[in-house]
């Protein structure tokens, strides 16, 4: 993914943050044994379409990321050794990581939360109760 990101430090930092948050949340939730692999791969690849979206649309709008990311992540993972079902679930998560309705699994919920926390941190959001 680092090569795929064309060395964009923001993108690399972001997907590593999302992966770290997702991994931590999953460990604390004690989820089933197969889900962490799918979740962690989805966390690392969730913004796989950002370079393409910047080039094609001039921005990284979430809906564009979801649409463009599915075929990219399927191709990226095609020789990874993951099963077709695992790749399909990762692709589904990449294709829905900006969709907050009808969340159908803990992997999707955790990915949404991890991405939100990373975005909030990167954008300086805070719920500070005292003067900083």
Describe these PLM feature segments.
Residues 3-16, 20-32, 45, 82, ...:
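Divalent metal-dependent phosphate-bond-processing catalytic cores, especially two-metal-ion Mg2+/Mn2+ enzymes
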Residues 8-11, 59-66:
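Flexible, glycine- and charge-enriched loops at secondary-structure boundaries
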Residues 84-91:
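Active-site-proximal substrate-binding core of FAD-dependent oxidoreductases
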């Amino acid at each position: 993914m680092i090569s795929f990101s064309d060395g964009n430090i923001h993108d690399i930092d972001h997907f590593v943050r999302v992966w770290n948050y997702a991994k931590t949340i999953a460990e604390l939730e004690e989820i089933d044994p197969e889900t962490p692999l799918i979740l962690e791969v989805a966390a690392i690849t969730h913004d796989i379409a950002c370079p393409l979206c910047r080039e094609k649309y001039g921005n990284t709008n979430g809906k564009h990321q979801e649409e463009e990311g599915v075929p990219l992540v399927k191709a990226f993972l095609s020789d990874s050794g993951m099963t077709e079902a695992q790749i399909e679930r990762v692709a589904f998560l990449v294709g829905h990581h900006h969709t907050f309705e009808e969340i159908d699994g803990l992997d999707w919920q955790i990915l949404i939360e991890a991405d939100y926390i990373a975005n909030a941190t990167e954008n300086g959001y805070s719920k500070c109760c005292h003067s900083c």
